[in-house]
């Protein structure tokens, strides 16, 4: 593979001297390198293939980091990273100690704002621009925002404020008709109606350029012409929402035609009012398998590049187990409906959406709306299931409290990607849900350790008239244990016992049950036998039952796949210490820090939650429990 142009770049400034032919060749090289690395490491493929030309045009027109580009969500930043001095490390993408799959301010001065969640770029870019102007600094600020991101309320809040401020922010609307799943809602349909004919755009650009060359009167004439155009449009044409917000709207533009993009971007640089460039791109551009199936190639694991076949695991994942469980529930209870925020495939709702389209609601990237919408459904007698990644539920905490918990409504939250999340880093770890939700009255919190236990606990949740959160990791389901079929008793977990008399009890949440089991096996090989208590219920807890159980052991080690502060392990240890005498105990959980990207095993190891760490701590704890009264 010839990457001579890409490898010759020392930074984005080198792009400005390339000929049009070299620019087109560079775009192909960038695509090939993205395909090569993502096929090996996994990552966000389709979105990155769709913005190659746009990224090149941005760096040819603007001078970063003097000018600032903020990428919304940030998963489409691979070409940006390749062009800003990180091509030599690109093979480490999303790997431990390698470059992140998202913009990171501590990784490069070209990454102006760290992102990972959707719809933040407009607010961040507006803040950066305001600070630059307040400090008397020049430089343009550009926010690159996907059409899917504009389904979130935060984006509209920013649009309203930016348009009202009369700043010179440039917004690039990357319209690929997708967020992760295909876009839904009236705004997506609205974008498809916005068409401005090419000849009109070219005429407007040429006229503006010609007027600007006229001394003294050129720029005032441009402003007068713009006001006249807006007045005429108001009288003669249907309103444009972006123009109504106060933006100069330009588009739609072909997002894969670099020369046109550069011409319009250069024009936008000269404007002194907010400008929105509507750019249409093809998600997965240049790789037929991704163009034909952009949803499957949005976030993808390692795959066969020649055949477009993603590596599949034989074992069942927790997401798949949830999908089967939900379908079984829907077959027997017609009150069950499902809600997602633009994550149909990721949350396992694809099959449900096909079988029960009238009972499936994709609200777009709008977690706040999703939760309150579910609250409304629950008020009207149905059983809503909100399937959402743990990290994205953070975006709707007020709605969980105010609209669901205060009214004690029977909404089920299926929290996927809870605990350690592989490869996506700080913004995507699902570490805070337990601590956040434990503090909220009325909510039950469940942590299944296997596919069968997920099914049992989901059945329990459906029978409740209160909110229930069920959390599970992005991981394969472990083999079933005999104890997992134990009937559900509110507030009680399951004890997995050994034949030998045990002095050690390992208490864990479901997401780390495999690591705790492996640790128990390691201890057994040393002649130290440990029972395992899978808590099942983080909230409520049958305190009397738990205190009676733990009193049988000399030492108790609590292991939790959430943050220690405010978590269940810390709470159970405090409860244990009310017993006199109390067994010797300790807590292993995620510490007060953000955990970077790596495999799930690497993230757990970094937190001291790997099987070797657990076994070593349990052994140490037992050694220091000598003399404890049982």
Swiss-Prot record:
Signal peptide: none annotated. Its cofactor is Mg(2+); thiamine diphosphate. Thiamine diphosphate binds at residues 75, 116-118, 148-149, 176, 287, 367. Mg(2+) binds at residues 147, 176. Catalyzes the acyloin condensation reaction between C atoms 2 and 3 of pyruvate and glyceraldehyde 3-phosphate to yield 1-deoxy-D-xylulose-5-phosphate (DXP). Belongs to the transketolase family. DXPS subfamily. This is 1-deoxy-D-xylulose-5-phosphate synthase. It comes from Treponema pallidum (strain Nichols). The lineage of its organism: Bacteria, Pseudomonadati, Spirochaetota, Spirochaetia, Spirochaetales.
């Amino acid at each position: 593979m010839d990457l001579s142009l890409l490898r010759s770049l020392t930074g984005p400034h080198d792009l400005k001297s390339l000929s049009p032919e070299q620019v087109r060749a560079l775009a192909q090289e960038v695509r090939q390198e993205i395909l090569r690395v993502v096929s090996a490491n996994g990552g966000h493929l389709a979105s990155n293939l769709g913005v190659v030309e746009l990224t090149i045009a941005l760096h040819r027109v603007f001078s970063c980091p003097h000018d600032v580009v903020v990428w919304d969500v940030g998963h489409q930043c691979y070409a940006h990273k390749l062009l800003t001095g990180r091509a030599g490390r690109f093979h480490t993408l999303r790997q431990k100690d390698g470059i992140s799959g998202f913009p990171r301010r501590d990784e490069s001065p070209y990454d102006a704002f760290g992102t990972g969640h959707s719809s933040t770029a407009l607010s961040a870019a507006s803040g950066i621009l305001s600070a630059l102007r307040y400090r008397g600094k020049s430089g343009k600020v550009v926010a690159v925002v996907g059409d899917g991101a504009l389904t979130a309320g935060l984006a509209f809040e920013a649009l309203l404020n930016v348009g009202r401020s009369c700043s010179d922010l440039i917004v690039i609307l990357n319209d690929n008709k997708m967020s992760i799943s295909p876009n839904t809602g009236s705004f997506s349909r609205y974008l498809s109606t916005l068409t401005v004919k090419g000849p009109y755009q070219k005429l407007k650009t040429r006229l503006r350029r010609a007027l600007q060359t006229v001394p003294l009167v050129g720029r005032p004439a441009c402003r007068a012409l713009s006001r006249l155009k807006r007045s005429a449009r108001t009288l003669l044409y249907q309103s444009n929402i972006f123009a109504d917000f106060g933006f100069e709207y330009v588009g739609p533009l072909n997002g894969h035609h670099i020369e046109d993009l550069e011409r319009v971007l250069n024009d936008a640089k000269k404007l002194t009012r907010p400008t929105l460039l509507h750019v249409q791109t093809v998600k997965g551009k240049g790789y037929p398998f991704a163009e034909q199936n952009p949803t499957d190639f949005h976030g993808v694991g390692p795959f066969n590049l020649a055949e477009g076949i993603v590596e599949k695991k034989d074992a069942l994942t927790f997401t798949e187990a949830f999908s089967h469980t939900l379908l079984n529930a829907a077959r027997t209870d017609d009150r069950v409906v499902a809600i997602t925020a633009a994550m149909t495939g990721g949350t396992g709702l694809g099959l449900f959406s096909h079988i029960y389209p009238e009972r499936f609601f994709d609200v777009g990237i709008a977690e706040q709306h999703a939760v309150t919408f579910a609250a409304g459904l629950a008020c009207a007698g149905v059983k809503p299931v909100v399937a959402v990644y743990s990290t994205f539920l953070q975006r709707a905490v007020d709605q969980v409290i105010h609209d669901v918990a205060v009214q004690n409504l029977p909404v089920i939250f299926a929290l996927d990607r809870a605990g350690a999340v592989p490869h996506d880093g700080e913004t995507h770890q699902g570490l805070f849900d337990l601590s956040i939700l434990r503090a909220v009255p009325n909510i039950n919190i469940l942590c299944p350790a296997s596919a069968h236990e997920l099914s049992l606990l989901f059945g329990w949740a459906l029978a409740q008239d209160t909110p229930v959160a069920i959390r599970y990791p992005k991981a394969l389901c472990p083999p079933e244990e005999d104890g997992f079929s134990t009937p559900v008793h509110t507030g009680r977990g399951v004890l997995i016992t050994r034949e030998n008399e045990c002095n050690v009890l390992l208490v864990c949440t479901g997401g780390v049950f495999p690591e705790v089991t492996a640790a128990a096996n390691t201890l057994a090989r040393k002649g130290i036998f440990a029972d395992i208590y899978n808590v099942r219920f983080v909230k409520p807890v049958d305190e009397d039952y738990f205190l009676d159980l733990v009193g049988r052991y000399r030492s108790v080690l609590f292991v939790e796949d959430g943050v220690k502060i405010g978590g269940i392990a810390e709470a159970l240890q405090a409860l244990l210490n009310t017993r006199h005498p109390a067994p010797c105990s300790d807590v292993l959980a995620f510490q007060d820090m953000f955990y970077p990207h790596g495999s799930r095993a690497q993230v757990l190891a970094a937190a001291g939650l790997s099987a070797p760490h657990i076994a070593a701590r349990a052994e140490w704890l037992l050694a220091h429990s000598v003399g404890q009264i049982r």
